[in-house]
């Protein structure tokens, strides 16, 4: 957070200016006393109007009158957070039991499985999840037979599923008819019975998945794969081994130093292959890992500003990708320099790191040097694994770099062409899994991931993972090791919605909420954890509605949002975060800044944070945040069915004329009553359900329904006994009332038909702001440059209803009005000229040539002006209307500001800033490379030739179909990015400000006056047309940004904790299998055919783009 509070000028300084230079016209500028008298009169008129027309006191009387219909219950924060934490523990524990059953069965079945080289025709029966996406696909591969399940719509999965079958997904670059795949399909079919049994024991289970180390994924229940017609080129790029949950479950955390050879021989195609390979390698790392990339020739250096290992989060990996994309090749190779540099950095324990697997990844075209003395010096005990990658087409002896890997418990890989990158940069996880397998039951610990986006469109989920080991003849005796392979990872999903149900919020008031964090400080649960959907860029109009949860099958990264980025950071929150990570319990009350729901405003409020650990899980702690006015809540006790029926009658659309246009918050009132985005439809369904089954039905949340009925009755009485009996009040376009229970009434009916606010009152920005303010809150409509004048809908004025029941403060509702802008302007103009003056400078005449009079709200948005051309800009940020004056208001402390970053945004390709350290979404090869068909043609031609010359004698058991990663579609998709937005707010108790805006050759006198009991200021200033000044716009709205400098952020990393256990070495490990001729290389004819397909796809894409 960046806050600006420049020193304010005093009234004395302003008076001195007036004496020295005088105003720009011959007539005197109105005195501060005169202006204040105008403002006081306007403020009195506005507050009286809002108070009288809204019926705020009348609603208080109604709540006090009917106290027999409700009780006031306490929100015991400590008790609530403890109960919720235990419920979450129980939920995750139940899911863990399902995982254990699956993992044990998988190991047992695979151990009993007899490997077969041949299968009879159609012997292996399974449902391929991608069958429905490719109607031209053959019904079956040799040895297999396809199942065609009958699917039904399922509300829990939000898609069609079949509980009778499991589905299989096989990556595009894996041949489905290969012997390995057929054997995998054969033995994993036994998991289907366990899947079904788990669901019988717990019908709320979501996806159950086994991800094989070979890339096959079997998941239950069966469901067609996502519609890849949404993806450019219709290429399915999913590989279970690259999903966040698989990466986390397959190996312990890693400290990785990637060492890149940039000598002169590494040039052209080889350098491009290395860049892509490093980028793919970075994608195999998660937030528990640490990484850096260094390059070397005759000298060694870091490729980026990072001078030590950094956390492998999304932002840091982007920095490294961009840096790698800019490396150049020159000089000669000195492996000693490179490895010395790598070991020194990798063994630096003075910085934050994973403190587990220590790895050096060498990417080179080969060489004659072995650097034995460096390994003898730094790695005598072989605690650091070295993996080597021979990249490109060359004639070097592979012996030296293969020796490096074999002598240092690593593995040697060859990447001769594009198609080998994807597989060979992820297979090192199998090697890191060896110590886990050898550790046996000690390593079989359920781990829970960060939040990420489910590939099958379930939304935001977390996944419990458990490694599955190959126990086939694992030990014949204590010393004769037979197997140390990881078969894969078992996963069970938990939807974030399931966790939210355990943290009920509808008694907390809209500004109360739960949140949970993991040991990295990332939030699992938080109202601001709302990533924007890929495919939706920065909106031209910032809607008040909260972003929907995202279903994006392309998302590979976890959705990582630090608690201190989810809220406005301060020292107390840093302390709370640290204590939560340490698993402590605690409570703290303090005053803090709060960003509004629509992210345009900053308010101040008292909050009490109460937190407790969530034991037995990977999530450190759960917290409950309550404002002072949420310590108690209303619990309705409408037991008589007659009263229930009378109140529900007021919700029927037929009664809108009498009761006002009514909106019902789309909540889960009953299990058989599904919320709808169509308000009228939902109201009809709600009333029909209540009439048929009564509010006391066992399938309903009785407290929720009774509260909504109570609010319906109270608000209807406000309409019937007060609003409807008032005569039409000039300047009032509408009246409204919004309640905690979920009722919104707008009167008259016609005004409700144009109501644009969120029917879910707990997510309504103006409602939440009103609760945190004691004043009347004026809210400007959203300005739309391309749309009609926003002012036509009126200015919203709202006020929280405060009641005290037995000394207990409650704010159960907000009332308000919408006022007509033209009437307001007319009224103020009359007010400002009641005392006639002699010249044009001394009042606020309509469309004055020399004087601008404006009213701004506490966010700096325009609400009223004496100029018609300003009127059409009502709702616009004033820094875009009169930027020089707005800057000056900041400089003299009328406004303070907060700059915040949104790490969950998406932007158009190329929209992100190009300068700075790597916050452009990096794809390697670059987009320019992708679109240059010559590069791909060269790559494919060399690859085909090399495969022909080198691979004839090394047919691969697992045949591959060459396919590049997401680089194909990068230039045609939205990209994740960082955006920044600045909120302005009052942070000064002074009521009046005066001064002179110096524009160099001229100046403008101004006076600012706050309107008491509101969130408004009045500004009278000499017209900007009389004195040209700085016209650079001051932007408040969301815009793309580099974000905080990552080079600075890694110097002071935030507090975190890694996993408690580490499996990085085992004395029984057999590391003689370290690559070489035993490696699995692509089949010749498969590679040749797919390389031509690759060329055709890319050239076709390029042709379409042209």
UniProtKB/Swiss-Prot annotation:
<dbReference type="GO" id="GO:1990454">
    <property type="term" value="C:L-type voltage-gated calcium channel complex"/>
</dbReference>
<feature type="binding site">
    <location>
        <position position="265"/>
    </location>
    <ligand>
        <name>a divalent metal cation</name>
    </ligand>
</feature>
<feature type="disulfide bond" description="Interchain (between alpha-2-1 and delta-1 chains)">
    <location>
        <begin position="406"/>
        <end position="1062"/>
    </location>
</feature>
<dbReference type="GO" id="GO:0046872">
    <property type="term" value="F:metal ion binding"/>
</dbReference>
<keyword id="KW-0813">Transport</keyword>
<keyword id="KW-0479">Metal-binding</keyword>
<keyword id="KW-1015">Disulfide bond</keyword>
<dbReference type="InterPro" id="IPR013608">
    <property type="entry name" value="VWA_N"/>
</dbReference>
<dbReference type="InterPro" id="IPR013680">
    <property type="entry name" value="VDCC_a2/dsu"/>
</dbReference>
<feature type="glycosylation site" description="N-linked (GlcNAc...) asparagine">
    <location>
        <position position="615"/>
    </location>
</feature>
<feature type="domain" description="VWFA">
    <location>
        <begin position="255"/>
        <end position="432"/>
    </location>
</feature>
<keyword id="KW-1133">Transmembrane helix</keyword>
<feature type="signal peptide">
    <location>
        <begin position="1"/>
        <end position="26"/>
    </location>
</feature>
<keyword id="KW-1003">Cell membrane</keyword>
<dbReference type="InterPro" id="IPR051173">
    <property type="entry name" value="Ca_channel_alpha-2/delta"/>
</dbReference>
<feature type="modified residue" description="Phosphoserine">
    <location>
        <position position="121"/>
    </location>
</feature>
<keyword id="KW-0325">Glycoprotein</keyword>
<dbReference type="Pfam" id="PF08399">
    <property type="entry name" value="VWA_N"/>
</dbReference>
<keyword id="KW-0109">Calcium transport</keyword>
<feature type="binding site">
    <location>
        <position position="261"/>
    </location>
    <ligand>
        <name>a divalent metal cation</name>
    </ligand>
</feature>
<feature type="domain" description="Cache">
    <location>
        <begin position="448"/>
        <end position="539"/>
    </location>
</feature>
<feature type="short sequence motif" description="MIDAS-like motif">
    <location>
        <begin position="261"/>
        <end position="265"/>
    </location>
</feature>
<keyword id="KW-0107">Calcium channel</keyword>
<feature type="topological domain" description="Extracellular">
    <location>
        <begin position="27"/>
        <end position="1076"/>
    </location>
</feature>
<feature type="glycosylation site" description="N-linked (GlcNAc...) asparagine">
    <location>
        <position position="350"/>
    </location>
</feature>
<feature type="transmembrane region" description="Helical">
    <location>
        <begin position="1077"/>
        <end position="1097"/>
    </location>
</feature>
<dbReference type="InterPro" id="IPR036465">
    <property type="entry name" value="vWFA_dom_sf"/>
</dbReference>
<keyword id="KW-0407">Ion channel</keyword>
<comment type="subunit">
    <text>Dimer formed of alpha-2-1 and delta-1 chains; disulfide-linked. Voltage-dependent calcium channels are multisubunit complexes, consisting of alpha-1 (CACNA1), alpha-2 (CACNA2D), beta (CACNB) and delta (CACNA2D) subunits in a 1:1:1:1 ratio.</text>
</comment>
<feature type="glycosylation site" description="N-linked (GlcNAc...) asparagine">
    <location>
        <position position="891"/>
    </location>
</feature>
<dbReference type="GO" id="GO:0005245">
    <property type="term" value="F:voltage-gated calcium channel activity"/>
</dbReference>
<comment type="function">
    <text>The alpha-2/delta subunit of voltage-dependent calcium channels regulates calcium current density and activation/inactivation kinetics of the calcium channel. Plays an important role in excitation-contraction coupling.</text>
</comment>
<protein>
    <recommendedName>
        <fullName>Voltage-dependent calcium channel subunit alpha-2/delta-1</fullName>
    </recommendedName>
</protein>
<dbReference type="GO" id="GO:0005246">
    <property type="term" value="F:calcium channel regulator activity"/>
</dbReference>
<keyword id="KW-0106">Calcium</keyword>
<dbReference type="Pfam" id="PF08473">
    <property type="entry name" value="VGCC_alpha2"/>
</dbReference>
<keyword id="KW-0597">Phosphoprotein</keyword>
<dbReference type="GO" id="GO:0098703">
    <property type="term" value="P:calcium ion import across plasma membrane"/>
</dbReference>
<feature type="binding site">
    <location>
        <position position="263"/>
    </location>
    <ligand>
        <name>a divalent metal cation</name>
    </ligand>
</feature>
<feature type="topological domain" description="Cytoplasmic">
    <location>
        <begin position="1098"/>
        <end position="1106"/>
    </location>
</feature>
<feature type="glycosylation site" description="N-linked (GlcNAc...) asparagine">
    <location>
        <position position="326"/>
    </location>
</feature>
<dbReference type="Pfam" id="PF00092">
    <property type="entry name" value="VWA"/>
</dbReference>
């Amino acid at each position: 957070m960046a806050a600006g509070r420049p020193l304010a000028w005093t009234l004395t300084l302003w008076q001195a200016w007036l004496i020295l230079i005088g105003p720009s016209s011959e007539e005197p500028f109105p005195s501060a006393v005169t202006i204040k008298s105008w403002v006081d009169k306007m403020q009195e008129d506005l507050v009286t109007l809002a108070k009288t027309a809204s019926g705020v006191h009348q609603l208080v009387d109604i709540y006090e009158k009917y106290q027999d219909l409700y009780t006031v219950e306490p929100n015991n924060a400590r008790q609530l957070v403890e109960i919720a934490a235990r419920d979450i523990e129980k939920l995750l524990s139940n899911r863990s039991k399902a995982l254990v059953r699956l993992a044990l069965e998988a190991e047992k079945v695979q151990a009993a499985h007899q490997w077969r080289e041949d299968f009879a025709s159609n012997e292996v029966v399974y449902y391929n999840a991608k069958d429905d996406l490719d109607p031209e696909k053959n019904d079956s591969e040799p040895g297999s037979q396809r199942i065609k399940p009958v699917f039904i719509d399922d509300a829990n999965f939000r898609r069609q599923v079949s509980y009778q079958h499991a589905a299989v997904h096989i990556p595009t670059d894996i041949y489905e008819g290969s012997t390995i795949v057929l054997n995998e399909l054969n033995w994993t079919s036994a998991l289907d019975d366990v899947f079904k049994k788990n669901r019988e024991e717990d019908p709320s289970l979501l996806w159950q998945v086994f991800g094989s180390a070979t890339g096959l994924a079997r998941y239950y229940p069966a469901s067609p794969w996502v519609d890849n017609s949404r993806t450019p080129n219709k290429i399915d790029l999913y590989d279970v081994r690259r999903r966040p949950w698989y990466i986390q479950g397959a190996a312990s955390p890693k400290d990785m130093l990637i060492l890149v050879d940039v000598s002169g021989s590494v040039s052209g195609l080889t350098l491009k292959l290395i860049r892509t390979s490093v980028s793919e390698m970075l994608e195999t790392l998660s937030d528990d890992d640490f990484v850096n990339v260094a390059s070397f020739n005759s000298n060694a250096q870091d490729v980026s500003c990072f001078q030590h290992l950094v956390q492998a989060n999304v932002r840091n990996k982007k920095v490294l990708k961009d840096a790698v994309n800019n490396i150049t090749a020159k000089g000669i190779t000195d492996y000693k320099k490179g490895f010395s540099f790598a070991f020194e950095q990798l063994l630096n324990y003075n910085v934050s790191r994973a403190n587990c697997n220590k790895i050096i990844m060498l990417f080179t075209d080969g060489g004659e040097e072995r650097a034995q003395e460096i390994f003898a010096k730094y790695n005598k005990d072989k605690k650091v694994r070295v993996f080597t990658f021979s990249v490109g087409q060359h004639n070097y002896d592979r012996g030296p770099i293969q020796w490096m890997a074999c002598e240092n418990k690593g593995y040697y890989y060859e990447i001769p062409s594009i198609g080998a990158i994807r597989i060979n940069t992820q297979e090192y996880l199998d090697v890191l899994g060896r110590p886990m397998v050898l550790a046996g039951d000690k390593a079989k610990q359920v781990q829970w991931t960060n939040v990420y986006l489910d590939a099958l469109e379930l939304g935001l989920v977390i996944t419990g993972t458990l490694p599955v080991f190959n126990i086939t003849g694992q030990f014949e005796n204590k010393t004769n090791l037979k197997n140390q392979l990881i078969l894969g990872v078992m996963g069970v999903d938990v939807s974030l919605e399931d966790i939210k149900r355990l943290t009920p919020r509808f008694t907390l008031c809209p500004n109360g909420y739960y949140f949970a964090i993991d040991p990295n400080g990332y939030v699992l649960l938080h109202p601001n954890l709302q990533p924007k959907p890929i495919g939706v860029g920065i909106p031209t109009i910032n809607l008040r509605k909260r972003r929907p949860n995202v279903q994006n099958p392309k998302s590979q990264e976890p959705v990582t949002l630090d608690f201190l980025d989810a809220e406005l950071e301060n020292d107390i929150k840093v302390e709370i975060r640290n204590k939560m990570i340490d698993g402590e319990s605690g409570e703290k009350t303090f005053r803090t800044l709060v960003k509004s729901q629509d992210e345009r405003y900053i308010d101040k409020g008292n909050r009490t944070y109460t937190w407790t650990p969530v034991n037995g899980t990977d999530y450190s702690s759960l917290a409950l945040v309550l404002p002072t006015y949420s310590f108690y809540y209303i619990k309705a006790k409408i037991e008589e069915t007659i009263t229930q029926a009378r109140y529900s009658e007021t919700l029927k659309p037929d009664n809108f004329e009498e009761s006002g246009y009514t909106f019902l918050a789309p909540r889960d009132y009953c299990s058989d009553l599904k919320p709808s985005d169509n308000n009228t439809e939902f109201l009809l369904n709600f009333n029909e359900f209540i009439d048929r089954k009564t509010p006391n039905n066992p399938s309903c949340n009785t407290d929720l329904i009774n509260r909504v009925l109570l609010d319906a009755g109270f608000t209807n009485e406000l309409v019937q006994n007060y609003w409807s009996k008032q005569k039409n009040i000039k300047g009032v376009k509408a009246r409204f009332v919004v309640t905690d229970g979920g009722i919104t009434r707008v009167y008259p009916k016609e005004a409700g038909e144009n109501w644009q606010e969120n029917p879910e009152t707990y997510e309504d920005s103006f409602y939440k702001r009103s609760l945190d303010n004691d004043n009347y809150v004026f809210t400007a409509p959203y300005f739309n440059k391309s749309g009609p004048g926003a002012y036509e809908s009126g200015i919203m004025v709202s006020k929280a209803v405060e009641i005290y029941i037995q000394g207990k403060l409650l704010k159960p509702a907000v009332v308000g009005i919408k006022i007509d802008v033209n009437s307001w302007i007319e009224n103020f103009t009359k007010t400002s000229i009641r005392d006639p003056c002699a010249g044009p400078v001394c009042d606020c005449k309509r469309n004055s040539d020399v004087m601008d009079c404006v009213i701004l709200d506490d966010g700096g948005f325009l609400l009223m002006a004496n100029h018609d051309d300003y009127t059409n800009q009502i709702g616009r940020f004033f820094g875009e209307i009169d930027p020089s004056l707005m800057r000056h208001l900041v400089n003299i402390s009328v406004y303070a500001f907060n700059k915040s970053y949104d790490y969950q945004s998406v932007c158009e390709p190329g929209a992100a800033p190009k300068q700075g350290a790597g916050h452009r979404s990096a794809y390697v090869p670059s987009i320019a490379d992708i679109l240059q068909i010559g590069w791909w043609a060269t790559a494919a031609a060399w690859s085909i030739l090399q495969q022909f010359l080198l691979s004839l004698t090394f047919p691969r058991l697992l045949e591959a179909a060459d396919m590049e990663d997401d680089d194909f579609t990068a230039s045609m998709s939205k990209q994740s990015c960082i955006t920044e937005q600045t909120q302005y707010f009052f942070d000064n108790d002074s009521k009046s400000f005066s001064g002179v805006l110096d524009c160099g050759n001229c100046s403008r006198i101004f006076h600012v006056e706050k309107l008491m009991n509101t969130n408004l200021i009045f500004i009278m200033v000499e017209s900007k047309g009389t004195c040209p000044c700085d016209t650079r716009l001051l932007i408040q709205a969301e815009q793309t940004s580099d974000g905080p400098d990552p080079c600075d952020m890694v110097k002071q990393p935030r507090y975190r904790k890694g996993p408690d256990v580490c499996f990085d070495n085992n004395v029984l490990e057999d590391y003689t299998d370290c690559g070489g001729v035993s490696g699995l290389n692509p089949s010749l004819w498969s590679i040749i055919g797919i390389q031509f397909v690759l060329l055709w796809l890319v050239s076709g894409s390029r042709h379409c783009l042209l």
